[in-house]
Amino acid sequence: MAFDYAVLGRKLKDARESLLISPQDSSSYLKISLQNYLDIEAGRNRITGDQLVLLAVLYRRDFRYFVTGDYPSAESQVQEMFRRNAALSKSDRVAIQEFVRLCEYEDFLEREIFQRQSVSLPNYRQFSFGHRYFKRQGEEAAIFERERLNLGTQPIENIFELIRNQGIHIFKRQLEDKNISGLYINHPVINELLPGHCILVNYLDDLYRQNFSAAHEYCHALFDSFQGQEITYLKLPNGDKNEWRANSFAGNFLVPKQRIELDYSPAKN
């Protein structure tokens, strides 16, 4: 069957537009005329192999996504994230796309080189809490998760290491939007049988907020992986119950109430 250059062109155009890259920048990057580049996106001009590899680098994609019709990727999740968060800057979009590639690279190394086995996380959305109070669900899930991991009542010293040990890909990247705390993506390539959990934490934040954001996104992995993606903002939308739950989980997971009561209860005479 003949290769469909029109489909390739549409993929290239979607990838370029998702990162807010102009056709002029792309043509300049390839050192070809603007019209020649537009003809590539329109499927009228056949792209060369080296040009395709260069564009894959520029657009932060795996080149196989462009040339394979059924190549699995997180493209739909990322595009949906950008669509729902249209105000994302060009640099933040690039940082997010680079984060996705880092997760893919890490997954390849862990599976193919280090033979790491997949870890199955509990899906607390399927758990029967017996009530619909989201903040309380977050607190109770934190208790269940600490029990599952045998954490006792001690504060978590390294939340990033703990999350990585659960088979989750987690990275810190600098995002220029200071209102973004972190984000979660369920990557279909990283784990074909289980959710491919990927977490990004904004490196611009102080360490305390980074730790809280990591635990917050961990809650989204435990509850909300079916949504495919989400971005967490410091200033939460009113009425977002999933974010209430994730905040409640994060605080109680990092430092349980029992520890606070033990360490800071008023001294008795």
Regions found by a protein language model. Name each.
Residues 1-269:
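Short juxta-domain linker segments that transition from a proline/glycine-rich
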